[in-house]
């Protein structure tokens, strides 16, 4: 039962993020924003979709497992940090890479301290979420795949902001 509630929450959270990103995209485009990294974006969507499916499949394959409260607490802390990061970006936050001409990177909230705090959060989420239910294969495989994907994405984003 806890697993179903957790997955429902996770999916709802991700869909909410996509809704916010879609709304922000409309605003960004109205400001003349240019999108970058279109080539790799479908792979990011696929990675995150397969991540959730892998959690479900591995959980079913393992049978019911106990919840690791330490990892659940870490996930809750990540959500707070994510809220801070996303709210600091405001309408500039998106799951895609956009740049409004004449603007620089946002430098408030955690972005004063780190160059890519949201990517740090995503790295931790991909590793920690499966560990809430002791799903080690999903944690390892998707942490590696996500690291590869983020190397591509961060390279593109850094190039965009260097222009």
What kind of feature is each model-predicted range?
Residues 4-9, 73-77:
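Membrane-embedded alpha-helical segments that form the functional core of polytopic membrane enzymes
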Residues 9-21:
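N-terminal signal-anchor/start-transfer transmembrane helix
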Residues 12-15, 46, 76, 114:
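Alpha-helical architecture
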Residues 20, 48-63:
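Membrane-helix exit/interface motif
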Residues 21-40, 66-163:
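Cytosolic-biased juxtamembrane loops and peripheral soluble domains of multi-pass membrane proteins
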Residues 38-51:
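Interfacial helix-start motif at the membrane-water boundary
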């Amino acid at each position: 039962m806890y697993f179903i509630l957790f997955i429902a929450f996770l999916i709802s959270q991700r869909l909410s993020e996509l809704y916010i990103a879609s709304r922000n995209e409309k605003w960004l485009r109205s400001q003349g924003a240019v999108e970058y990294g279109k080539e790799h974006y479908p792979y990011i969507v696929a990675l995150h979709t397969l991540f959730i499916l892998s959690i479900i499949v591995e959980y079913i394959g393992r049978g019911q497992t106990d919840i690791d409260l330490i990892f659940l607490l870490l996930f809750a802390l990540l959500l707070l940090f994510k809220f801070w990061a996303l709210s600091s970006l405001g309408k500039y936050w998106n799951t895609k890479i956009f740049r409004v001409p004449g603007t620089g990177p946002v430098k408030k909230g955690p972005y004063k301290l780190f160059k890519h705090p949201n990517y740090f959060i995503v790295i931790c989420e991909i590793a920690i979420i499966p560990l809430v239910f002791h799903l080690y294969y999903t944690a390892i495989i998707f942490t590696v795949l996500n690291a590869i994907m983020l190397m591509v994405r961060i390279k593109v984003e850094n190039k965009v902001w260097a222009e």
